[in-house]
UniProtKB/Swiss-Prot annotation:
It catalyses: D-erythrose 4-phosphate + NAD(+) + H2O = 4-phospho-D-erythronate + NADH + 2 H(+). The active site is at 154 (nucleophile). The gene is epd. NAD(+) binds at residues 11-12, 317. GO terms for molecular function: erythrose-4-phosphate dehydrogenase activity; NAD binding. InterPro entries: E4P_DH_bac, GlycerAld/Erythrose_P_DH, GlycerAld_3-P_DH_AS, GlycerAld_3-P_DH_cat, GlycerAld_3-P_DH_NAD(P)-bd, NAD(P)-bd_dom_sf. This is D-erythrose-4-phosphate dehydrogenase.
Length: 338
């Protein structure tokens, strides 16, 4: 049984916990502790009730400083300094670092010094970590000596499996990406101050361009794609699910049917459970709570002049990513034990 702790219990932290119980991986992973500065009553309430993902079916209770989920007891901590967390006493194997604020190796090593054996960051990180993993593509690079690993981003997990498939079958010369991302909690409900002037504006009233490092994230997973991609991102007034508009120029000449067939076969084969394919006339809310990293919308595939291909990809940017956190942590333990 892998003993884990969650540091930072926001959207991703709570999704990880709920996904653990819904995915059937509870027999392999035990959440021992949650470190979150919010009040325990709010922690328990937001675990039980969620606007996006609905009510959590197991009954959740607060007893003293512990959250009870069925027979499971989870210690609630409120320690702002990771170096002071009791990971050694709790025998923590992996910390899910989900604050969004601790993103480099030096900061994450505070968890290691506190006694945790490994750290998995729920965010793109600095280049000094032991590895950045997109599960399904490069988890085989994990080694026993790796202690600090990044799970990349939800959009990197969405797009990299598709690029990998296209490149292996047709060769990818270059690409351009537009991420159409749901609003996030770094935006404002009504106009208010923010360092990014666009994010001073009300999230529910505008389509808001934001910076993205997605193209650089692709390069980290697929180094041979260096300088081949550029990306922009906009936030839209929805609370969950992201669409990615991917345009790629291929080495080979293709048609719509060929591209869709290759992607559907990959979804049913090597990337089963990671990549999906649909030809139904669906909209974003239909992918809410979908555990896959990426779903190709075959109805929107377009080909121009035989080599310019445009695809529409969907992902639940919370739930899919949370499930990959679980998968990657299991792969980290497997590598450590090999």
């Amino acid at each position: 049984m892998i003993r884990v702790a969650i540091n930072g219990y926001g959207r991703i932290g709570r999704s990880i916990l709920r996904a653990l119980y819904e995915s059937g991986k509870r027999q392999q992973i035990q959440i021992v502790a949650i470190n979150e500065l919010a009040k325990p009553e709010a922690i328990v309430h937001l675990t039980q009730y969620d606007t996006t993902h609905g009510r959590f079916q197991p009954r959740v209770k607060l007893v003293d400083d512990q959250m009870l989920i069925g027979d499971d007891v989870i210690k609630i901590l409120h320690e702002p300094d990771p170096a002071k967390l009791p990971w050694r006493e709790m025998d923590i194997d992996i910390v899910y670092e989900a604050t969004g604020a601790i993103l480099d190796r030096n900061s994450c090593e505070a968890h290691i010094h506190a006694g945790a054996k490994q750290v998995l960051i729920s965010h793109p990180s600095s280049a000094d970590v032991d590895g950045t993993i997109v599960y399904g593509v490069n988890q085989d690079l994990l080694r026993a000596e790796h202690t600090v690993v990044s799970n990349a981003s939800c959009t990197t997990n969405c797009i990299v499996p598709v690029i990998d498939v296209l490149d292996k079958h047709f060769g990818v010369k270059s690409g351009a990406i537009t991420t159409i991302h749901s609003a996030m909690n770094d935006q404002q409900v009504i106009d208010a101050y923010h360092d990014d002037l666009r994010r001073t504006r009300a999230a529910g009233q505008s389509i808001i361009p934001v910076d993205t490092k997605l193209a650089r994230g692709i390069e980290r997973i697929l180094p041979h794609m260096k300088d081949k991609f550029e990306a922009i991102s906009v936030r839209v007034p929805t609370i969950n699910v992201t669409a990615i508009d991917l345009s790629v120029t291929l080495d080979k000449t293709v048609d719509i049917a060929t591209v869709n067939q290759v992607l559907e076969l990959a979804a049913n084969g090597r990337f089963n459970g990671i990549l999906g394919y649909t030809d139904e006339p669906l909209v974003s809310c239909d992918f809410n709570h979908d555990p896959r990293s990426s779903i190709v919308d075959g109805t929107q595939t377009r080909v121009s002049a035989g080599q310019l291909v445009k695809l529409l990809l969907w992902c639940d940017n919370e739930w899919g990513f949370a499930n990959r956190m679980l998968d990657t942590s299991l792969a980290m333990i497997a590598a450590k034990q090999s």
